[in-house]
UniProtKB/Swiss-Prot annotation:
Residues 19-212 form the Lon N-terminal domain. Induction: By heat shock. Coiled coil: none annotated. Belongs to the peptidase S16 family. It catalyses: Hydrolysis of proteins in presence of ATP. One of its GO terms (biological process) is cellular response to heat. GO terms for cellular component: cytoplasm. It comes from the Bacteria. This is Lon protease 2. The active site is at S688, K731. GO terms for molecular function: ATP binding; ATP hydrolysis activity; ATP-dependent peptidase activity; sequence-specific DNA binding; serine-type endopeptidase activity. The keyword ATP-binding applies. Homohexamer. Organized in a ring with a central cavity.
Length: 815
């Protein structure tokens, strides 16, 4: 030790020294610190050999980064420590262990050489031995903080604090504490580069406070973890002891009893072979797993789903056609085709048994016609359970097929969930609003439904959650839609389309009388105070308070009347027992609708067209105005692309037939034609207004009026041929309601007349046409066709004299 003090004194006496440099990786050496260093680089070995051949003094300097070029002195810090090499030991792996002791801080003055080792000129930094009351106070604070750190730390030895407590020199105390703290290289180097002891102690106080906060938080976390581990171990030991006690007493523990009950349920559930094997396999995993394991609840939930699903339980089908027919007749008015189809299915099941595949019906019709309620009646007629799944707004394929069990919170798809609610394997399953399905990046649910609705595949439906084939073939699927256009073609191909058209006025009156009024009287507590609504009042409600093809809003209006009566009864006021048309304003307010009526006079340029929407049929007056201009055509009324093209075709037909119609062909270049379809706020589209547009344009050009009691529908070609259209039944009913008695329809639509009720057909005249030459004599008050050429059915032209057209009789069909 005397030699060491003498060496330090000699070093301190010199202003600068030239010494070899040992770069340190991920280490900062402090004065008085003794530490082993492991050296492998040739540059470092050369520096050590040079020091050993001299006075064993070497400058230990930390590298700024772990990976640097060996001779790159710019990556070395400028402040280091002179170290005395105590021992050098070569190891079997080729590295060298060097034991060094730090002595004094030095500042690098100049880098003298980098070959064969780094040599530098250094200036010794004299240690700061200043002593004051402030330094004494800081030493005490640092020691107190250091004591806390040593107590909280799991890695620092207890004698580290004892060693620090025995130091009286402030600089030595600061260096000792800094060398033992678990700091990164940057913070260690910052402490090394603080030459004034007061500043070093102040910085060390901050570092110790931060370290105390970290250690206390770590200690808190460790305690929490240990408590949980101890509790789990305690619970485990208690359960094991309880199990042993119960075994000694001949009792069964609850967990074992629960697992045994699960096993018995699996055996008794009459599962298919694959499902039973899967259930027993999962039960085996459950038995090997502690209840606290996260997977335990996942497997248990999966087994509950397997056991609660109906795998073989069925409802006995009704085998009496008369009973089924009576149920359908009591619950629904009309709908003859639908009822016949259901009775046919029951008859086939009676003859063929379970071998016949259940049909997949698609009820298509406007809102409120009874599609959903008809599904319930079908289930009642068949004696089966009824379940319903709404598909409106479903965008994710997983809604149909479910999620795999690898996902947190995974559940079966809505098909399997609904089957669990059904409780039997052969319910009537209604997929409501199938035309409202969507798709996005999560998949296409319509594609998943292809398997559900395919009788050849749905006996092995694959739900991702179950991961087992599930038999859907015994289900009678019924889908509902307002429109067929949005439904994917492959999906539509799997379904049998059953159209539910809108009700006519007389049907609505009968439905209200038989179903809606009794239902609302009971719902509003008027069974002891019954009321009646006259047929005239019902018709007035239908015509002016509702605008629909079904009866949903009609039921709301009847309910509104019943509620007003219920209030008067509750207030013990007088109320009418029979509702007449004159009372409707008092009960329902002013009527919001007014069905279109036929024009009260024959007009030029105004043709009556027959239209159809989801709310039913109606008539619309298409207007054409001719003004001086430059040959432009204007179309207004929010017309769609197809209807605009139809208007252009009608205009081209009129121009091509101008000579036959007595129109000056040059006139088209001097006029502007404006075609308008009223109710501009309502979008309109479709080709069926072609002949109506043509008649309106021809009337305006020839200045001949059109008959107000004639309505028409049909697509037009450039040669004047009339092509078939859709929605004829609703269009005829709408025109009939508007007071039209003569209707022009395409000849190819004659087959659709069977759908028109007989009582309506008897009161109207329907004229079937194939060409505009047949339309014009009936649509106009005076035939615009003059003596001249006329198109034949094959498109050729021939000179004819038109005969006088006699007006057809009511109830007739002109071919």
């Amino acid at each position: 030790m005397a030699d060491d003090r003498q060496l330090v004194d000699e070093i301190s006496a010199a202003t600068t020294l030239e010494l070899p440099v040992l770069p340190l990786i991920n280490t900062v050496l402090f004065p008085t610190m003794v530490t082993p260093l492991f050296v492998a680089r040739e540059l470092s070995m050369a520096a050590i050999e040079a020091a050993m051949s001299a006075d064993r003094q070497i400058v230990a300097v930390a590298q700024r980064a772990i990976e640097i070029e060996e001779h790159d002195t710019s990556q070395l810090y400028q402040v280091g420590v002179i170290a005395h090499i105590e021992r050098v030991l070569k190891l079997p792996d080729g590295t060298t262990s060097v034991l060094v002791q730090g002595q004094q801080r030095v500042q690098i003055v100049d880098w003298l050489a980098t070959e064969p080792y780094i040599n530098a000129q250094v200036q010794i930094i004299e240690p700061d031995h200043e002593s004051s009351l402030a330094i004494e106070a800081m030493m005490r604070g640092v020691l107190a903080s250091y004591e806390k750190v040593v107590k909280l730390s799991r890695t620092m030895p207890d004698d580290a604090y004892v060693a620090a407590l025995n130091l009286e020199d402030a600089s030595a105390l600061a260096d000792l504490i800094a060398s033992t703290l678990p700091l990164d290289i940057v913070r260690r180097q910052q402490l090394l580069e603080l030459f004034e002891v007061e500043e070093r102690l102040r910085r060390l106080s901050v570092v110790l406070s931060q370290e105390i906060d970290v250690l206390e938080l770590e200690h808190h976390i460790q305690n929490q973890v240990q408590k949980e581990v101890d509790k789990s171990q305690r619970d485990f030991f208690l359960r094991e002891q309880l199990k042993a006690i119960q075994t000694e007493l001949g009792q069964e523990d609850p967990l074992t009893r629960e697992l045994n009950e699960l096993h018995d349920r699996i055996v008794a559930a009459n599962l298919p072979a694959k499902a039973q094997a899967k259930a027993l396999e999962e039960l085996g995993r459950l038995e090997m797993m502690p209840p606290a394991a996260p997977e335990y609840s996942v497997i248990r939930t999966y087994l509950d789903w397997l056991l609660e699903l109906p795998w073989s339980k069925t409802s006995a089908d009704v085998a009496d056609l008369e009973v089924a027919a009576k149920v359908l007749e009591n619950n629904h008015y009309g709908l003859k085709k639908v009822k016949e189809r259901i009775l046919e299915f029951i008859a086939v099941r009676m003859l063929a048994g379970d071998s016949t595949k259940s049909p997949i019906l698609c009820f298509v019709g406007p809102p409120g016609v009874g599609k959903t309620s008809l599904g319930r009646s079908v289930a009642e007629a068949l004696g089966r359970e009824f379940v319903r799944l709404s598909l409106g707004g479903v965008h994710d394929e997983a809604e149909i097929r479910g999620h795999r069990r690898t996902y947190i919170g995974a559940m079966p798809g809505r098909i399997i969930q609904t089957m669990k609610d059904a409780g039997t394997i052969n319910p009537v399953f209604m997929l409501d609003e199938i035309d409202k399905l969507g798709n996005d990046f999560r998949g296409d649910p319509a594609a998943a439904l292809l398997e559900v609705l395919d009788p050849e595949q749905n006996n092995t439906f694959a739900d991702h959650y179950l991961d087992l084939p599930y038999d859907l073939s015994k289900i009678m699927f019924i889908t509902t839609a307002n429109m067929l256009d949005p439904i994917d073609e492959p999906l539509l191909d799997r379904m049998e389309i059953v159209e539910l058209p809108g009700y006519i006025e007389e049907e609505k009156v009968q439905i209200a009388r038989k179903f809606l009024i009794p239902k609302q009287i009971e719902a509003n507590g008027l069974k002891q105070h019954p009321i009646t609504i006259s047929d005239e009042a019902l018709r007035q409600i239908i015509r002016t308070y509702t605008w629909e093809a079904g009866v949903r809003n009609l039921e709301r209006e009847i309910g509104g009347i019943c509620r007003k009566i219920a209030r008067r009864v509750a207030e013990k006021k007088r109320y009418p027992r029979r509702i007449t048309p004159t009372m409707l304003t008092d009960f329902l307010g002013q009527p919001p609708f007014d069905y279109s009526r036929a024009n009260d006079r024959d007009e030029i340029g105004v043709a009556t067209g027959m239209v159809w929407s989801s709310n039913g049929g109606d008539v619309v007056a298409i207007e054409t105005a001719i003004v001086d201009g430059k040959g432009t055509t204007t179309l207004t009324g929010q017309l769609g692309d197809v209807m605009q093209e139809s208007a252009q075709a009608a205009l081209s037909y009129a121009r091509a037939s101008s000579r036959r119609l007595g129109i000056d062909g040059k006139r088209f270049e001097k006029i502007d034609i404006h075609i308008h379809v009223p109710e501009g706020g309502v979008p309109k589209d479709g080709p069926s207004a072609g002949i109506t547009l043509a008649c309106s344009v021809i009337s305006a050009l020839t200045h001949r009026p059109l008959r107000r009691d004639v309505a028409m529908t049909g697509e037009i070609t450039l040669r004047g041929r009339v092509l078939p259209i859709g929605g004829l039944r609703d269009k005829i009913l709408g025109a009939y309601r508007a007071g039209i008695t003569t209707m022009l329809i395409p000849k190819k639509n004659l087959r659709d007349l069977e759908e028109v009720p007989n009582n309506v057909r008897r009161q109207i005249t329907v004229v079937a046409v194939e060409h505009m030459d047949e339309v014009l004599p009936i649509a106009f008050v005076s035939n615009p066709l003059e003596r001249g050429s006329q198109h034949t059915s094959d498109g050729d032209q021939t000179s004819v004299v038109l005969p006088t057209i006699t007006q057809p009789q009511l109830g007739s069909v002109e071919l």
